[in-house]
Every structure is written in structure tokens, then in C-alpha cells.
């Protein structure tokens, strides 16, 4: 559970006077009274409930467990797989010689076997193939599932029922399979919290983030996906990752009641950041040391911990900045330090939004930030409510700090006032209103399902400009897609892309520029046709047949696989357009 999700849920509950459930899947959460702990800590509103899959299952009666609908025919012999029980713990595990999980048995609070989760169904002792079996008190099989995804979906069906509901997913891990949870009565929303690329410094068409690859390829399967900033939304829209289902809803921040007129030591800087490579704290230390070397009084207090602490400690000593920079480690409620600080630094390589920037501004503390993707440039007006510096430019960062230190008191007070005013755009009320606008715009209309749709290649040709594709589509039913795309995915790595296709009766055409596939320098790609409806999404693997005509080049070989599907093999290095 992220702090952002807790704060948003509490804001929904408080401002809209509604009950909100936070759903968790981890077995480690079973038996932990996190709801009570969080409420006592003031982290959640009294109308917010923390609900855990395993806490539910281990306390439910057989009558309620039977509401969990399986997706495969029950095999009674599954009971023979039970592990010997070695104690009174609710879990028994079986692992291979390398410590990889092969089986987990879970027990009901009443003491009887509840679940057997085997993950070596293809060959015992080797991971591969899964079967999750749910048992009743009489130890007879209630239901079975071949995947954790189907198992989780069955639980969600019981939890949500038939009433209209809004399901907001904050987890990339869950997002990678929850996009398949489509129910007419559930509006499904995905929140993209961080950079969509595997390498934030890569070109826009580079590999997608591995931990998000499952859901980034299926954004149109959600009713709506939110980004935290307009700039990230624009970047994702330029790649056609979504057909108009992306929208911006920022994180909310607390009103810290920063006083622009409050006297503060001008030289006092603060920074809240993990001490990790992503946060690039070494640049902040170097900049402070440079400013101090020019006989300007300046200090920096850094709050946070992480793997880089030993390196940063050595750097502080080598820069003779022990009296200038202090590493405080993790401190609860560190954002309150901004109320007495004059300026803050952000030197990250990338951000989802940069919540710490909003916290600084809310406190009237002037942010001096690298203009990285994504966040600072969406929030800060340079020279008005803060300062923006080219990413990685330590000298530029030093210059910005020096500029701030040299401003008149009147200029600084005005800047603090502007910072607080800008932060107010992200306080709880306006962001909850924005969520209300986004969710109320969604529909509970029946979801269009076209599992039988078929797309077949007519011609596919590698030209000087790219790949020219013609195909025919059939069996899509009565509903017409509002948009169609040809998509491709690399078999290795996390490369994915799509371009919009055009339709003339049953003929579909698309042009894929070489530049879109340029980052894939070697290997195989598979092509599909994406059908996007107002509410509904289907990805159809494009088939080849005996009449399909393929024209390849020495760099890209187009062909039909042994299973009769349209694929390509990139033989050489990056393809470039000659147009």
C-alpha cells in the first residue's frame, strides 16, 4: 500500500462522505491489523477499510467460499497433493533445491486445509503449470483455477458483487493482470505512477518499463488510465499507447499552511530523497560544495536513507562539506522541515510527478529542481514559483542556488507566495473534484466482447518508408470499433508499439514507419490488430494464410509462423527511413 493510495482513499471518504475499501492480495498481510494501526497513526479516515484476500478466505464460511467460481473442471485428486503439516502455522511450503516456490498450502482459521497452490503441474519438482484448489471444511474441492489471475478475479467478484463500483489500481504488479478483469458493473481505472520507459534517458520509442509491461500494452482494456502529469500523458499519447483513455489526475498534497512572510535563514536548504542512484543526491552535494567554495553561506539537510549513503558520506568528506551537508536518514513527517527551510533541491533522474516538490511549495519553501521527466516542468514556473535547471547540470544547479541566495527579501517573499498558491492547485479538494469529474464521465454500459474476431494478412511489404500492411477482418459482430491499431511486441525485451489503422469495408490498412521499430535492433516481433470500442478492447493476433503475400528486405523478414501468424524477424541493426 502506497502513502498516495492511503491519502487519496481517505480524501475520497472524508470529502465525499463515502466508505472506501483498499484491497490487498499479499498473504503477508493476513493476520496483521493494518487498518487499526493506520487509523491510530492518523494515516486513514475512519470510513476507509483495509481488506485482504487471505484474511477473507481464512475466515469465510463454506457457504461464502462457494461463491468463488472456478474456471476449470474440479479434480478431486488435488487433495492428494497436501503437504505434511509441521506445526500450527497457517502456511506450509514446498520449494526446489534452489529455493523457488513449488507449492503453498494455506489453512483456515478453524484449522482445516483451505487452499493448495501447486506451481509444478507440468512436471513435479520443476516450476511450470499452476493449479489453485479451494477446499471446504469437509476437505472436498469447492473450485479450481489455473492461474493466480483467475483466482484473484473470483475473489473480486465476491467482494464487489453486482453493484456499480469503481476499482482503482495503484500497483504495477496488479495492473499487469487486472486489465483482464472486465465486468459491466465495474469501472476499471489504472494509475500510472512513474516513468513508462525502462530507461528514462532513452528515446521515446525505447523499451517500456519491465515492471509495467503487462498493463502498458493493454491501456485500452481499462476504462480510464491516469497519469500524474500532462507531459507524461502527451508522451504516451504520441506513441498511440491508448485510444483516448488517458487523462491527467495529479497526486494530492497536504496544505502545510506555509507562511510566505515568515522569516527563514536564507541559506538553509533541505532535501527529502531516497539515497539511491535514481535520486542523484551526489549532484546536490556537489552543487552545495560549489556554492560554499564561492564564499556564500549555504547548508543542506538531507532526509532519507538508502544504498548510496556510504558513497555520499565519502563525497561530503572529500568535498570538505561536512559542515555544509548533513545526512539525517529517514525521519517520520520529514515534510514539515520545509516549513522552516528556505529552499529545497530535487536532482532525480526521473519522477512520476515529484510529490516532494509540491510539499516544498505548500510550505513556502522554494524548489530548485532538475527539469526531468516528469513533474517539475508541469508544476514550477521558472523564476516565479521556483527554479528549473537542465538535468545533470551541476554548475547550473549551483548557479540557481546562488541566484536564489542573492535575491532581495521582497523578491523571495513574492516567490514564496507564488509557490504556495501553485501548490494549492494540488490540495485535497481540487484533486478529489478532478477524480469526481474523471470517474463520473465513465460509463457502465455493457462491455463489447469480440473473442471470435479474426484478422488475416492480405499483403505485407517492407518499403523504403516502413512496413505497409493490408488485412481483412471478420467475425467482429455488430459493434464497430471506434478505432483500430496494428500493434507489435518483441519476443525478447519489452519493446511494444502501435499505429492507427484505417478501414474501408472489410479491408484494413496500416503503415508502420521504420523509425517506430528502430530501437529493436535484432530478434523477432509479432503483429496484432487492436480493436478499441467505447467500452471494450480485443487484441487479435494477425493470421497469415496461403494467399498472403509478403515482401521483405535484407533488414526485415516478414513471414507466417508455423502456427499461421504474422511475424517479422529483424536481421540487422536499427532500421532508418530513407524518406
Show which residues each predicted segment covers.
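Donor nucleotide-sugar binding/catalytic pocket of nucleotide-sugar-dependent glycosyltransferases
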Residues: 187-191, 196-197, 204-257
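Conserved donor-binding/catalytic core segment of Leloir-type glycosyltransferases
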Residues: 260-279, 285-288
